[in-house]
């Protein structure tokens, strides 16, 4: 497969909306390639990118404020369809002579969009009996529609909520079609990229694999490649994909740091070394990691220690493979976006990432990142296509530092062993009760505090384990999962009875925000 799957592409310009990555994911779900770039992308770069269409995202600013984010005026003269969402619609309206003012009544949440006049092809199937439920999030609105544009949607509080200029192929919506709270929003984005922009939908798992295999072979040639295999989804799929491309030229290094889930090391070896025939070097480094972490309780310092030691051990092993020229990583597109944002100052680096930018300059290997264009759901889809086990591909996210950041405070072997067993019981019960696939992320946390208990006729003074389970579509916000009481009771009873050293189990009912999903 050639690079044809990239020939039809959509450009998304980001004005700072919390939902911008969701726009990209919806475009990809329509089987069309897209990239996300800052709103101030140079016009020459946009021309070179040659998009079939452009989407302007929402954003937190007001278009009439001094210094408000804007695009080069010639953007609208490129002759490709443009869809403005929320701030993007207001920006486009103002550019063509319309007016944007503060709304008398701000709209946040659900609203009914009512069809006005004759909505164009973008809205085919979007309105049912003249209306469509949508999700609003705006404090400004368009008060005067620019010449050439027609209003095709309104709500009770905003008379201009959807506009179109069919002659110039320009469209704007005040609502957010990218979020799940707009039920037919996915259809609207699909219609824009497929019907309005004319993309045929070549971005499919099979085509992505064929394209990646061709590119890996062209990039690597006959060179040797090494990859740090963690057992997580991203590195596992990267390993399977690279092995599909170059076979025995790939050697994986699996560093068992003593902070993995129960029996995870054996499972990784069984999947890759035994079933797929991948060359895997397993390094038992538990003692080195626990020694390095001794006495350290600061979460960020623990992350740095674990990350640095992993690189040190990986380098030791890679030096033994003297003819290796490439280092492969399971970097995915959100990692790339987040790291770029941190460099440009347009995003905050909340937690250090275990993967992107973590390699020292003295490692002279060239970088191979076959997943760097893909979102997590796309990675999972190609993982299944490559034949990886369903449970491995669809397992919940696991942090790079492993249990090191699920043990609060200092990491000790005793704590890790307790947490491993408690977590395994928790996950086993979630599977058995049919909850696991409904939950976005679930895990146990070890709390280094003891509480008084009673077992039999004796008093106990043992540790506390917290259970966390959340539901989320994007991991930017998350709600706690309402696990039924009878399931909580069964899980708690099993952990207390089967895991020595625990006499109390608690359930975390914090949402994100204000809490993060992980405890550290």
UniProtKB/Swiss-Prot annotation:
GO terms for molecular function: ATP binding; GMP synthase activity. It comes from the Bacteria. One of its GO terms (cellular component) is cytosol. ATP binds at residues 230-236. It catalyses: XMP + L-glutamine + ATP + H2O = GMP + L-glutamate + AMP + diphosphate + 2 H(+). Pathway: Purine metabolism; GMP biosynthesis; GMP from XMP (L-Gln route): step 1/1. Gene3D superfamilies: 3.30.300.10, 3.40.50.880, HUPs (3.40.50.620). Its EC number is 6.3.5.2. Residues 203-395 form the GMPS ATP-PPase domain. It holds the Pfam family GMP_synt_C. The active site is at residues 86, 176, 178. Residues 9-202 form the Glutamine amidotransferase type-1 domain. Keywords: ATP-binding, Glutamine amidotransferase, GMP biosynthesis, Ligase, Nucleotide-binding, Purine biosynthesis. Homodimer. Catalyzes the synthesis of GMP from XMP. This is GMP synthase [glutamine-hydrolyzing]. It comes from Geobacter metallireducens (strain ATCC 53774 / DSM 7210 / GS-15). The lineage of its organism: Bacteria, Pseudomonadati, Thermodesulfobacteriota, Desulfuromonadia, Geobacterales.
